[in-house]
């Protein structure tokens, strides 16, 4: 039957080459789907079902076990079950304390609507400032958590803090499951998923910050990004049926939008993803229709996010929107020419140039007409980071000194090498990248790709999902080599790509094709290696790292900070309810969470006004006069000043990166570069001088509380000068 129907199909192709391709592929899918029950033996169907069932069970189990591991480790580290509420809250440091404090505020609100209104018109957090906390701090996770806590009746079963961290740990389990599924989809075996999870957990110092800062936005957002990438991987596969394609598209749409709502920097990651898809389409490796369907998801998510994020201008001026709009315009201007011809190659180059030019032009136009203040400090930081500008600005230099914003250290590469992750990742990346280049050159020369690539072909670079991941991981890795904090986005996909490679017979077959192996049957050897290599890696990881993981769970650690507990207790008992506190932003976040009192600054770095406040408040550790400090504090209506001994007497490993050094540089009290003049301040360091209790400091400030770590001063409203 198939042979008799062959010639008419070819005639139809000649008459209607465009429409018939889709029809023929659809027919082939239907034909391949229908006969399976008739031709495939029952034991083959059972094997397929068992493989899928075991893989799904392993993926879900891996996610659940990881979530339980995080919960147990957190309990051992902070001993939550034996702590009072105040001691538990102190474990939330910096910006994490701010996020959790708003979760508490939502639970205390008389109704959900009232709670949302108070957050969107918040004037009880920062003095002299009304902020839309939901928009500015992306508090949608806290809104959702508070709804779930009250709607499910969990307030009668579990404490709010356990419910909150339980949701985050559950999301981390979903994160691991999504990575498992992605590696499984790419390699065809769930063994790759198991190896991905093993590498992820072993290298968790470099894969996640969940152990140190639970409420961080990335801990809420990245699990959805992992789900989006898993769906995109399935969507790009060429052998996916119609129902699978629809499911992947719907999952990708939902996860993309959720990811964008959870994290203010999500559109930058999606921008890198869009670049990867653009390059995939440029080299004609994937059907343009599929790629442009993904672009539609970006546009839908951006505009829906813009509306639901209180008309957030950052989304309108984002490079993602400019790039997608440029790609859509370029598609409208594209000409239909014969693929592989010289004219087609020229048009490809012109199209690439057109997209780049339109992206930059549209972004400039949007920034001209859309008022925005978002991420201006980020551009300044990048200029200083890459040496395009020099500055003595305290905030910029302080950011440069942060470990997460510096280049990766040697210890980072050593850890990845010891776990065998880095060597196998480099091997897999090189093979996939070279195979991808072969495909690109083949397309440039006008050669068409095979509709179905078999194992014997040894062409792993012809698979669109593989090429996408290669491009994406190269982009992420390049950025992570400059800013170490981006490793938490890159390394999880390093685990996934390395595990896929060593478990993929196609990758080994591609390597054997290049080596022209003839002594042993290459297909048989590829199948053996795809099972043996991950098994050997897994056994070695089990032997070396499993005892360490068990030891961590057995050790009972203790987070002990009595000085901070005493400070918070004193504030709650002695300070007036309307008091405003000034101090380091990190401490102010803890005060906001533990006491609810108003503060002058917050540990947030996405607002220019807050950054300026932080710099001004930090002047209490500089060589400024008592009068200058008094004027700064009273300008923010502060009533109490808290001096931290750890900052005032800081002995940092890097001279020039201590807070007091950065302040001296900004104020011109220290040599910064050759040629700079050293100016001497006639005043001592304020944080030292104010402790001595002599005039004029006692005229402006009265010490009301102190312990080993903190000194609290009341800012006098009536100044009495003493001789």
From Swiss-Prot:
It is a multi-pass membrane protein. The modification N-acetylalanine is found at residue 2. GO terms for cellular component: endoplasmic reticulum membrane. Keywords: Acetylation, Glycosyltransferase, Membrane, Transferase, Transmembrane, Transmembrane helix. It is found in: Membrane. GO terms for molecular function: mannosyltransferase activity. Widely expressed. Its main location: membrane. It is an enzyme of class 2 (transferase). Residues 18-32 have a biased composition (Basic and acidic residues). The chain crosses the membrane at residues 52-72, 161-178, 184-202, 222-240, 260-280, 292-310, 316-337, 349-370, 421-441, 466-486, 489-509, 522-542. This is Probable C-mannosyltransferase DPY19L4. It comes from Homo sapiens (Human). The gene is DPY19L4.
């Amino acid at each position: 039957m198939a042979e008799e129907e062959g010639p008419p199909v070819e005639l139809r192709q000649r008459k209607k080459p465009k429409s018939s391709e889709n029809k023929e592929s659809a027919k082939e899918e239907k034909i391949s789907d229908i006969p399976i029950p008739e031709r495939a033996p029952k034991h083959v169907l059972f094997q397929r079902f068992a493989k899928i069932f075991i893989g799904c069970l392993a993926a879900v189990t891996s996610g659940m076990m990881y979530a339980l591991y995080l919960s147990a480790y957190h309990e051992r580290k902070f001993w939550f079950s034996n702590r009072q509420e105040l001691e538990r809250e102190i474990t939330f440091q910096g910006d994490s304390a701010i996020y959790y404090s708003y979760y508490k505020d939502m639970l205390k609100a008389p109704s959900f609507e009232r709670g949302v209104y108070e957050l969107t018109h918040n004037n009880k957090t920062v003095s002299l400032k009304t902020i839309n906390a939901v928009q500015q701090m992306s508090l949608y996770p806290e809104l959702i958590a508070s709804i779930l806590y009250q709607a499910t009746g969990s307030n009668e079963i579990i404490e709010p803090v356990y419910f909150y961290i339980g949701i985050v740990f559950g999301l981390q389990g979903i994160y691991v499951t999504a990575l498992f599924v992605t590696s499984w989809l790419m390699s065809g075996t769930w063994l790759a998923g198991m190896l991905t999870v093993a590498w992820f957990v072993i290298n968790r110092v470099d894969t996640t910050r969940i152990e140190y800062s639970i409420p961080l936005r990335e801990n809420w957002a990245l699990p959805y990004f992992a789900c989006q990438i898993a769906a995109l991987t399935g969507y790009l596969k060429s052998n996916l049926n119609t129902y699978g394609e629809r499911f992947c598209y719907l999952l990708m749409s939902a996860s993309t939008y959720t990811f964008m709502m959870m994290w203010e920097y999500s559109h930058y990651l999606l921008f890198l993803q869009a670049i990867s898809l653009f390059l995939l389409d440029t080299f004609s490796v994937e059907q343009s229709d599929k790629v442009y369907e993904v672009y539609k998801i970006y546009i839908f998510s951006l505009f829906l996010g813009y509306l639901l994020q209180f008309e957030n201008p950052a989304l309108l001026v984002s490079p993602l929107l400019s790039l997608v709009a440029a790609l859509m315009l370029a598609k409208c201007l594209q000409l239909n020419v014969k693929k592989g011809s010289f004219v087609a190659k020229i048009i490809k180059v012109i199209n690439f140039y057109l997209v780049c030019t339109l992206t930059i032009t549209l972004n400039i136009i949007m920034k001209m007409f859309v008022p925005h203040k978002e991420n201006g400090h980020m551009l300044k930081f990048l200029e200083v980071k890459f040496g395009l500008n020099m500055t003595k600005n305290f905030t910029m230099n302080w950011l440069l000194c942060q470990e997460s914003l510096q280049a990766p250290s040697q210890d980072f590469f050593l850890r990845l090498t010891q776990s065998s992750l880095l060597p196998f990742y480099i091997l897999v990346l090189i093979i996939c990248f070279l195979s991808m280049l072969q495909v690109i050159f083949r397309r440039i020369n006008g050669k068409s790709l095979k509709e179905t690539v078999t194992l014997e072909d040894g062409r792993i670079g012809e698979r669109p999902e593989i090429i996408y991941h290669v491009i994406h991981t190269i982009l992420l890795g390049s950025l992570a080599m400059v800013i170490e904090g981006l490793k938490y986005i890159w390394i999880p996909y390093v685990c996934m790509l390395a595990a896929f490679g060593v478990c993929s017979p196609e990758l080994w077959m591609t390597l054997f094709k290049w080596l022209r192996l003839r002594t042993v049957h290459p297909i048989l050897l590829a199948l053996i290696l795809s099972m043996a290599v991950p098994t050997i890696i897994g056994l070695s990881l089990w032997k070396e790292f499993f005892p360490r993981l068990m030891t961590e769970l057995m050790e009972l650690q203790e987070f002990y900070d009595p000085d901070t507990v005493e400070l918070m207790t004193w504030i709650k008992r002695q300070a007036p309810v309307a008091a405003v506190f000034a101090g380091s932003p990190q401490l102010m976040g803890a005060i906001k969470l533990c006491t609810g009192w108003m503060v002058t600054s917050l540990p947030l770095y996405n607002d220019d006004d807050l950054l300026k406040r932080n710099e001004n408040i930090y002047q209490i550790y500089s060589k400024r006069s008592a009068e200058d400090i008094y004027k700064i504090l009273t300008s923010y209506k502060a009533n109490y000043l808290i001096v931290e001994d750890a900052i005032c007497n800081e002995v940092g490993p890097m001279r020039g990166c201590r807070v007091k050094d950065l302040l001296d540089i900004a104020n011109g009290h220290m040599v910064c570069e050759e040629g700079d003049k050293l100016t001497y301040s006639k005043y001592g360091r304020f944080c030292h001088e104010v402790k001595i209790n002599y005039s004029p400091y006692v005229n402006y400030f009265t010490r009301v509380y102190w312990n080993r770590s903190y000194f609290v001063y009341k800012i006098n409203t009536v100044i009495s000068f003493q001789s």
